[in-house]
Amino acid sequence: MIKIRELVKVESLEEAWELNQKRTNKILGGMLWLRLGNRNVQKAIDLSGLGLDQIEETEEAFSIGCMATLRQIELHEGLNALCEGLLHDAVCDIVGTQFRNLATVGGSIFGRFGFSDVLTMFLALDASV
């Protein structure tokens, strides 16, 4: 169970970074991975207002925000065309659609879980974080 004392919706990455320096504060995403243990969080840092849920395409690369969901990855036409469906195939069987609608790329990478198909997918693509 997770207990949150205060929720802070930050207005900048700098503010989030500053708050995250204290060990009892945690950045929130979909919160699915935080539920894996008992936690007491002094300040929960909400990044939802920072536009980090975007997938942007340039001529050189794709940029995937840390708040982009696994479902966004699964359905993104440009990413899947480039990778011949690899990203769709890597995430489409992760739990269920409702879970993928909430689970974020950032949480999947940061958690470094041994069962993570997302980590393997980005490793295979030689992605930069």
Describe the predicted segments one by one.
Residues M1-V129:
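C-terminal structural segment of proteins
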